[in-house]
């Protein structure tokens, strides 16, 4: 099984809903699947929902390695918080999930071409 990404053209268009359904369906079919929300801004509700759909033993930091408190796009949130989104942190978390699961469903941020 291959890993894949769920993306959308905006926020609040159903990416989390679809990602959770895919993870849950794969697990019900006997496939060791997990969700992954590389970057979240504002809150971690999407990551919590992905954890409910997938393996319960994963921490929010494993499912969502970059969390920015400002509820805006990642680039602006990082600037407001005087930080940068470290792609290496995201890749390490993704690699760890990929090594431990047959399938990782990656939920993208609000816009398909958003700058992080």
Regions found by a protein language model. Give the residues of each.
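N-terminal phosphate/diphosphate-binding loop that engages ATP/GTP or pyrophosphate donors
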Residues: 17-84
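Glycine-rich phosphate-binding P-loop
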Residues: 6-19
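Switch II (G3) loop of P-loop NTPases
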Residues: 102-112
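Extreme N-terminal starter segment of soluble prokaryotic enzymes
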Residues: 1-4
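Conserved small/polar residues in nucleotide/adenosyl-binding loops
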Residues: 114-116
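Cytosolic-facing regulatory segments adjacent to core modules
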Residues: 86-90
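Fold-independent oxyanion-binding glycine-rich loops
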Residues: 8-10, 38-39, 107-109
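Short, high-confidence coil segments that cap the C-terminus of an alpha-helix
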Residues: 31, 100-102
């Amino acid at each position: 099984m291959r890993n894949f990404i769920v993306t959308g053209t905006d926020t609040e268009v159903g990416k989390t809903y679809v990602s959770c359904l895919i993870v849950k369906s794969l697990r019900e079919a006997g496939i060791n699947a997990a969700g992954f929300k590389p970057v979240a801004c504002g809150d971690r509700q999407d990551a919590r929902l992905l954890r409910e759909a997938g393996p319960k033993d994963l921490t929010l930091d494993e499912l969502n390695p970059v969390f920015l408190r400002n509820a805006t796009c990642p680039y602006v949130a990082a600037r407001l918080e005087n930080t940068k989104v470290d792609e290496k942190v995201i890749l390490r978390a993704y690699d760890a999930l990929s090594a431990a699961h047959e399938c990782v469903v990656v939920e993208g941020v609000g816009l398909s071409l958003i700058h992080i």
